[in-house]
Amino acid sequence: PKSNLPLKVIVLDDTQRNDDVNNPNSLGFGHGSLDQQRYDWLVQELELGQAEGKLMMIAAHIPIGVEPFPSMMGWHELAPVTEAQLIAKLHEYPNFILWAAGHRHINTVTAFKSPDPNRPELGFWQVETSSLRDFPQQLRVFELVRNSDATVSILATNVDPIVSEGSLAAKSRTNAVA
């Protein structure tokens, strides 16, 4: 890594807490959700990173904008901070470039285009990663590259760990959930 690319990684717990939603019909706590305290903290971190001129990424468990409620993969419809509010807020920071998430255990990339066509720098990317436990048992390496034209590229590389035949790791692949 080179130190001339200032990067702030914000690690965010965006999982539904047992006190986030006062709903006896909740299907558990697998949804995305932010209470006001976590949201305020996130906004403070984004403001600070923007003021410091740092590129910013968020590492969270639950992806955003993927599947509507009641799917267990998306944001809870009764979350104190709605998914739409969160995405709109993220679009306010030109230095915010990446939301990295797991939860669905799939490898996919989604563009969140700027709501203002005259300000494309307000858009960002979401990269979802697979699981080390479940099929396909991969990990992802992220590289941020400053290009010669002053743009930034995000490289997301899937890695298949090499495992010895007959090892516990190799056996686990035969038991991985597909």
Name each region found by the language model:
Residues 103:
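Conserved active-site segments centered on acidic
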Residues 19-39, 47-100:
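Active-site-proximal segments of metal-dependent phosphoesterases and phosphodiesterases across multiple
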